[in-house]
């Protein structure tokens, strides 16, 4: 499957054992070329499919497939701490499993803004992801059990810091490509 075959990719969610999803792309689940309503199929498999953050915040247990945005989630300046809240909501739901859980959180727009060489938006997305990971580390420290791993599967854009002033909290960055590079992502 090619990454551009979005409708085929999201159809696989119906067969997946995943317990919690939050993100954008609602348009790919309804009004499809194949006529399927994936939200209805997910509900038939026991998923709750809230259409807003308010609906999601009221859910106390069970499988959740929350894709309230037609395309992408809002820009960082418009969404506030949405990624952190959605991540912590998922943790609250998944943590009810006595066997534990695995959760993957992706800062998906980081890749897009790397391809676009948009340093301002890349920094906003990075800051949002950092805040989210900070909230998760705080939760993990309180809980005492979880292992939190942060990594990247590749780098995009060839971002290099070429100047700035640490005291002022400013930096100057340059990009060398709009493509993915073969660099291995670090693990923290």
PLM features: what roles do these ranges have?
Residues 2-188:
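A post-motif C-terminal structural segment
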